Amino acid sequence: MSMADQLQIPADIKPRDGRFGCGPSKVRPEQLQALSTTAAPLFGTSHRQAPVKNLVGRLRSGLAELFSLPDGYQVILGNGGATAFWDAAAFGLIDKRSLHLSYGEFSSKFAAAVAKNPFVGDPVVIKSDAGSAPEPQSDPSVDLIAWAHNETSTGVAVPVRRPVDSGDALVAIDATSGAGGLPVDIGETDAYYFSPQKNFAGDGGLWLALMSPAALARVESIAASGRWVPDFLSLPIAVENSLKDQTYNTPAIGTLALMAEQVDWMLGNGGLDWAVKRTADSAGRLYSWAEERDYTTPFVADPKLRSQVVGTIDFVDDVDAAAVAKILRANGVVDTEPYRKLGRNQLRVGMFPAVDPDDVSALTQCVDWVVERL
């Protein structure tokens, strides 16, 4: 019998819900219940008819309220997830050249997608080591500046502020794991894009972008230039359909319904301010615990860059974090493993709004209990 099978964490210290994944993330039971009640009549019906379009409209209006969208900004959506949006943006938001901050797996991927696109110039890439981040900056040769609000692979969060002297360059923020859990002034961005499976406790396969009038104008001007774009990645097509409360091709009703329920739940509890305070509470508990123990330390050295939605905790060499995660998983406390390509002796903890801060505290108790017995 393995150590993971032998160690049984006492029930009275375990979290009430043991899901701490960084995406897919915890889905609240009330969201799942809605799939079989209020959303049930929508399954198997046309996405071009009022019932499904009303669901899309509910989601779009909810996001507009949650993020206090400035005048002229629009909620645009399409199928394919934020990964698809990287290619869509390369085709439809970059006129000639872009600048990218690269400080982890996901912030580097947008730059890589742009580098492969034959219609735009080679991107300017500003790199830093994992666990840190470059300062947002401008460059006179670029017309789009991009970085990630939250680097999911490392737990680094970079504030969203339009760089000085950025001129007419658009600011595109990958908010896949930041939107809904980190503070943001949408007016500082032109395309703030994300997916449902992080803070919004939904399934993947959908991208959403909060787009400014300048971004919408850029979409139109690039389309008018005659640049070839696959229809599936066409931002003009996405904009046209979104303004009609629909997607270009058939959406997953469950994904839309789960996310709409989560947005309504956030709004009902106090909106983005409430959600940000909740994730900050969770993060405060995790990082203070890690700093108090002699066998753990936060991976992100600069407290100002530590994410309050994705926490990465390093362990000393003589404590095997992988063994800890395996024992936790055997006891129903799941998805605390680090990002696979980072290759560190650490745990990674999702602290999205659906996660109860008390469960984060319980997780730390469980880790203490396990480490004492290794």
From Swiss-Prot:
Cofactor note: Binds 1 pyridoxal phosphate per subunit.
UniProt KW keywords: Amino-acid biosynthesis, Aminotransferase, Cytoplasm, Pyridoxal phosphate, Pyridoxine biosynthesis, Serine biosynthesis, Transferase
Chief place of localization: cytoplasm
GO biological process: glycine biosynthetic process, by transamination of glyoxylate; L-serine biosynthetic process; pyridoxine biosynthetic process
Pathway the protein contributes to: Amino-acid biosynthesis; L-serine biosynthesis; L-serine from 3-phospho-D-glycerate: step 2/3; Cofactor biosynthesis; pyridoxine 5'-phosphate biosynthesis; pyridoxine 5'-phosphate from D-erythrose 4-phosphate: step 3/5
Binding site for L-glutamate: R48
Oligomeric form and interacting partners: Homodimer.
PANTHER family assigned to the protein according to its UniProt record, in alphabetical order: ALANINE--GLYOXYLATE AMINOTRANSFERASE, AMINOTRANSFERASE CLASS V
Protein name, entry field: Putative phosphoserine aminotransferase
Organism of derivation: Mycolicibacterium paratuberculosis (strain ATCC BAA-968 / K-10) (Mycobacterium paratuberculosis)
